[in-house]
Amino acid sequence: MAGAGSLMNDVRFLGGHGTSRIEGGRDNPYNNTHTADPDLARRWDGQYPSLWVTDGGGGTFFDIWTPGTFAQSGMLVSNTATEGRIYQMSSEHHVRYEVQLHNVSNWRIYALQTEEERGEGGFALPLEIDSSSNITVANFHIYRVISVFQPFPYAVKVSNSKDIRFRNIHCYSNSKVSFDGTIYDQAHDALMRQREFAWLDLSGAAPAAPPKRDSVVLADGAN
């Protein structure tokens, strides 16, 4: 079991973009329409998450590159309250999810980068946090390549969670379609639309309602 004091350092998960062949050449990840692998037997989104920490696992994960399009996500953390830390992970080129936290407490994520490609990542969610608490996400860089033509409603989805802290979030794409918003709180149907911000705390409580103001046009005595 990977406990709080364990370490994974400098790991590149095989598969997907950037994979070299045995003879040294580049492995082409696309068919001629960018809709699948050239070998149809190598199905996108058909494997378990590349890195799965579960059932009380934890520890430090440093300098990880997980770009395998064949996996359901780059990293899944589930069912653990053991302390965990992620430093400088790049999770890229997945079909559905880049990083997922399910029923997790006491984890900190620093300098995470996610990236979606046009062919496989049009509907990919960079970060999902579900039924979790006491989570810190800091210096998070969320990116989509310029050729993406499929918009997506949000970059981070938080549901049934509390004490979630975001620090220094950068959500960027130089394509015409990107994310409509950055963070979506599903429990309260609240969307954070700002792409660059220094901090945001989600306590789990409903957001404060804005004060009601009389309309300038309909106020008594208006001309």
Pin down the residues of each PLM region:
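Extracellular/periplasmic carbohydrate-active domains that bind, remodel
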Residues: M1-N223
